Amino acid sequence: MRFDILTLFPAMFTGPLTESILKRAAQAELLQFHLHDIRDYATDKHKMVDDSPTGGGAGMVMKPGPLALCTQTVLSADPNPAPVVLMTPSGRVFNQTIAREWAQLPRLVLVCGHYEGIDERYIERYVTDQVSLGDFVLTGGELAAMTIVDAVGRLVPEVLDPESLLHESHDDGLLEYPHYTKPAEWNGVAVPPILLSGHHAKIAQWRHEQRLRRTLERRPDMLRHATLSKKDRQLLKEWGWEEKSEGKNQKAEG
């Protein structure tokens, strides 16, 4: 999968894209990262990429010209079509469902906004989607783009062992279960005995119940969309879940 990232600060991506899983995936040619400095596409002698807001106001706005030229060049560099996604607090909230969808694509173009924003004429002409990491504001889109590259890239086939992706948080509407490793007792706290029993079915059941409990305690809103069996719903109610308050449209399994 190819990622094209349009940014005013390409150096910010050096660490995240050259370490750990993303580095190995790039070396294995499973992922490609192409950084494009928007300033290189400014045509005036001062390489201006921003200007004051029309109509007045604070800050600066990114000019449409350099962004448009950069986008046109990037899109023409590869025959595969690609969504052009703007990082903006005004966009829909990025989540695991979107990450899974995008991981099936051959290519993704990410546009990093900065300053007060981007000229709306560029957005209307070139941007096909707009996403946010949540209800807060960053100084620019670079950190959001890094997060999206990591979240999407790790889901691309062969980047990770498929087993590593099973039962992750948000994978099926539930949070992940707690993890433990050696030693069996640390600082006076023991690993749950069931995990040392060797009984795989009981371990799987314990982990599933932990996922239910953790989701109820930390993100009860997620239960609205989770696929819950009758036994799951019974357990949750025993733990204080009020099903009606979480919505009436939960998907159910027998």
From Swiss-Prot:
Coiled coil: none annotated. S-adenosyl-L-methionine binds at residues 113, 133-138. Keywords: Cytoplasm, Methyltransferase, S-adenosyl-L-methionine, Transferase, tRNA processing. It is found in: Cytoplasm. InterPro entries: Alpha/beta_knot_MTases, tRNA_m1G_MeTrfase_C_sf, tRNA_m1G_MeTrfase_TrmD, tRNA_m1G_MTases_N, tRNA_MeTrfase_TRMD/TRM10. One of its GO terms (cellular component) is cytosol. Pfam families: tRNA_m1G_MT. It catalyses: guanosine(37) in tRNA + S-adenosyl-L-methionine = N(1)-methylguanosine(37) in tRNA + S-adenosyl-L-homocysteine + H(+). GO terms for molecular function: tRNA (guanine(37)-N1)-methyltransferase activity. It comes from the Bacteria. Its EC number is 2.1.1.228. Gene3D superfamilies: 3.40.1280.10, tRNA(m1g37)methyltransferase, domain 2. The keyword Repeat does not apply. One of its GO terms (biological process) is tRNA N1-guanine methylation. Homodimer. HAMAP family: TrmD. Specifically methylates guanosine-37 in various tRNAs. Belongs to the RNA methyltransferase TrmD family. This is tRNA (guanine-N(1)-)-methyltransferase.
